[in-house]
């Protein structure tokens, strides 16, 4: 049996969806989906246009029907959809109406198990209601928490006789795994729609499905806790701040020299302005790869210099962030040690021992705790709280992937405003 590849066009702008589809569909896509964001933004005209552009392909309308089943299925079918998605969380009455309307208008019904508490039980129930397909779906927001669909996919595919598909972060590494767990169709979104080359990405996925190949990728996959530092090493401070809803920035903290790069977990220090005792003692307390984050009140005198830097390098400290002042800037630059600071000045204070190591501190409006993650580069430093680390490291990667796609569209001759349809999406007040 040939495994169907479904392309999920989860854009809000039809012109961007069509640009990707025109490149990807000829490379091996079987089913072309107007994603939920696209339908909400552009209406069923998105389905009509996909039907016009790809008359020989199966068109999917991801309506996520929850109520008014007959009305929504009829509308989508008349617009040209062959397959229409309905939520498994909908009532049996709604699903039955969808099934009947689908029969009347020549469309098939796909039930999406997203967020149902017992997917196997609900799959059996909706199969009995007469649906044509069932999709196991890990939603985007759960993907960001490193959830995957494969155990549920296997259980559902073994429990029902209708074709079962899968959606939720599938990429060239995991597509074959989806097939091995029982998928009859595989839904792919970001691994194609965010790829620099959608055609090449589609060909890789097609090969993975047809040959059972595992094709490694650094993108379009979500990391667990053990891989947080790897993910953060790939993203920028700006990517991470965007993921955190433009937050997490240590305002006023700047890199000591250009080209600097810092990724690590925080060991916090609070000290009196100019008192360098606790910062130097923290070097001995630090584990290799940790970053010293020092609250020195945002003022001088300096609490860090060349000799402390030599000690930190020997200990394997990844870098230092100082809300205060450092000195010996030229020597530190020659050592290429990552330093981010508010101030640089020649005068140091005295080691009086006032302060603490490992306590929560605040730099500007941002709280930093020992164990939090930091990403620093030419733009400055962004802090990722450890309690949010898995989800928002993955969201930062999602930001990077989306920017990669936008950059390619700009290179093709359009402006940023044109690619993002900026005027259309300005907030109306």
Tell me what each language-model feature is.
Residues 1-70, 126-129, 199, 232-239, ...:
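Conserved N-terminal beta1-alpha1 strand-loop-helix module at the mouth
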Residues 3-9, 32-34, 59-63, 84-86, ...:
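Hydrophobic faces of well-ordered beta-strands that scaffold small-molecule active sites
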Residues 20, 68-79, 117-129, 159, ...:
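Catalytic cores of alpha/beta
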Residues 40-64, 97-115, 147-170, 204-218, ...:
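Alpha-helix-loop-beta-strand connector modules within alpha/beta enzyme cores
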Residues 68-152, 159:
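Conserved anion-binding
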Residues 98, 179-182, 190-218, 396:
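C-terminal helical cap(s) of enzyme catalytic domains, especially alpha/beta-barrels
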Residues 132-187, 191-192, 362-365, 369-397:
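Active-site/ligand-binding-proximal alpha/beta "capping" segment
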Residues 217-370, 383-429:
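Feature captures the catalytic cores and cofactor-binding loops of soluble hydro-lyases/lyases
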């Amino acid at each position: 049996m040939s495994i169907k590849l479904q392309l999920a066009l989860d854009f809000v702008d039809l012109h961007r969806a069509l640009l990707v589809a025109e490149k990807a569909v000829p490379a091996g896509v079987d089913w072309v989906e107007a994603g939920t964001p696209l339908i909400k933004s552009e209406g069923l005209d998105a389905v009509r246009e996909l039907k016009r552009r790809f008359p020989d392909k199966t068109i999917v309308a991801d309506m996520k029907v929850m109520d008014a089943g007959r009305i929504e299925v009829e509308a989508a079918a008349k617009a040209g959809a062959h397959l229409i998605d309905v939520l498994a969380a909908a009532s049996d009455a709604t699903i039955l109406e969808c099934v009947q309307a689908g029969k009347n208008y020549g469309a098939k019904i796909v039930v999406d198990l997203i967020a149902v508490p017992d997917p196997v039980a609900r799959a059996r129930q909706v199969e009995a209601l007469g649906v044509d397909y069932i999709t196991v779906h890990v939603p985007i927001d759960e993907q960001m928490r490193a959830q995957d669909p494969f155990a549920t996919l296997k259980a559902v595919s073994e429990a029902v006789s209708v074709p079962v598909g899968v959606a939720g972060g599938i990429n060239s590494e995991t597509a074959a795994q989806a097939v091995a767990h029982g998928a009859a169709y595989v839904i792919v979104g970001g691994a194609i729609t965010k790829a620099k080359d959608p055609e090449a990405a589609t060909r890789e996925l097609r090969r993975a499905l047809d040959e059972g190949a595992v094709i490694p990728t650094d993108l379009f996959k979500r990391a667990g806790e053990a891989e947080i530092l790897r993910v953060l090493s790939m993203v920028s401070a700006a990517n991470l701040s965007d993921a955190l809803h433009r937050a997490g920035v240590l305002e006023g903290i700047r890199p000591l020299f250009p080209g600097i790069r810092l990724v690590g977990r925080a060991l916090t220090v609070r000290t009196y302005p100019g008192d360098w005792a606790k910062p130097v003692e923290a070097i001995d307390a630090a584990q290799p790869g940790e970053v010293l984050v020092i609250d020195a009140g945002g003022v001088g005198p300096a609490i860090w210099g060349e000799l402390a830097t030599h000690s930190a390098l020997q200990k394997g400290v990844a870098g230092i962030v100082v809300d205060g002042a450092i000195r010996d800037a030229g020597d530190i630059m020659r050592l290429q040690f990552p330093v981010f600071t508010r101030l640089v000045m020649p005068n140091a204070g005295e080691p009086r021992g006032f302060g603490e190591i490992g306590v929560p501190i605040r730099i500007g409006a941002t709280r930093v705790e020992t164990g939090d993650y930091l990403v620093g580069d030419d733009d400055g430093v962004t802090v990722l709280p450890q309690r949010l680390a898995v989800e928002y490291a993955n969201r930062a990667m999602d930001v990077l992937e989306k920017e990669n796609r936008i950059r390619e569209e700009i290179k093709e001759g359009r402006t940023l405003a044109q690619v993002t349809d900026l005027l259309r999406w300005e907030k109306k007040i």
